[in-house]
């Protein structure tokens, strides 16, 4: 029964993503110190990735700790936990936080950017636009049903997966402390 439910959820996500037109962008980055003014403007350009372009962000041998959160504007539990993630990131600048929007690329200018501004989201946002959800969900975690919010926390030694929302800042902090 659980397998049928998981397959139904994956199929539903696949259908949703099949409706999205695939776009691409260059995946280039450089290390630099970010000023507070740049932090405010971090989401002026939101990159749109397919999974092959996105995958290097979640599989890195860096010494950093990463928090990658999959979310969407239409997901109430996702929106509820965004302030906790934002607060955590402000208090822990050594942790690389990336918010992965699963919204439609056509909504970036008209809905996503205004939403981020209204909610004072200053963490890096990327948009994942890949119709083959059945393939990429399993690559992220074979146990992930595809439901959001979904968060990956990792460093070069360990990976933790959370298919639930964080209840508050303390909940988020307690989970990331579990990394070696």
Language-model features and meaning:
Residues 115-148, 156:
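Short, internal strand/loop/helix patches
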Residues 148-180:
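Thiol-/selenol-based redox modules, centered on thioredoxin-like
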Residues 64-66, 71-74, 104:
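Short pre-active-site segment immediately N-terminal to redox-active cysteine/selenocysteine motifs
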Residues 70-87:
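Conserved redox-active cysteine motifs that mediate thiol-disulfide chemistry
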Residues 26-28:
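Bacterial signal peptide processing site
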Residues 45-66:
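A short beta-strand-turn-helix
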Residues 21-24:
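C-terminal motif of bacterial Sec signal peptides marking the signal peptidase cleavage site
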Residues 82-119, 133-138:
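Structural microenvironment flanking redox-active thiols in thiol-disulfide oxidoreductases
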């Amino acid at each position: 029964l659980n397998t049928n439910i998981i397959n139904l959820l994956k199929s539903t996500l696949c259908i949703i993503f099949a409706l999205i037109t695939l776009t691409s962008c260059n995946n280039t980055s450089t290390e630099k110190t970010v000023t507070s003014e740049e932090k405010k403007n971090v989401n002026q350009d939101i990159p749109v990735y397919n999974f092959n372009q996105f995958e290097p962000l979640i599989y890195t041998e860096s010494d950093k700790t990463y928090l990658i959160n999959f979310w969407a504007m239409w997901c109430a539990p996702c929106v509820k936990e965004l302030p906790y993630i934002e607060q955590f990131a402000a208090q822990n600048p050594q942790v690389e936080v990336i918010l992965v929007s699963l919204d439609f690329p056509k909504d970036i200018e008209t809905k996503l950017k205004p939403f981020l501004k209204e909610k004072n989201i200053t963490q890096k946002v990327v948009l994942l636009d890949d119709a083959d959800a059945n393939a990429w969900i399993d690559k992220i975690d074979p146990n992930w049903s595809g439901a959001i919010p979904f968060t990956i926390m990792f460093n070069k030694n360990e990976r933790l997966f959370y298919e639930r929302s964080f209840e508050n800042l303390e909940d988020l902090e307690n989970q990331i402390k579990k990394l070696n």
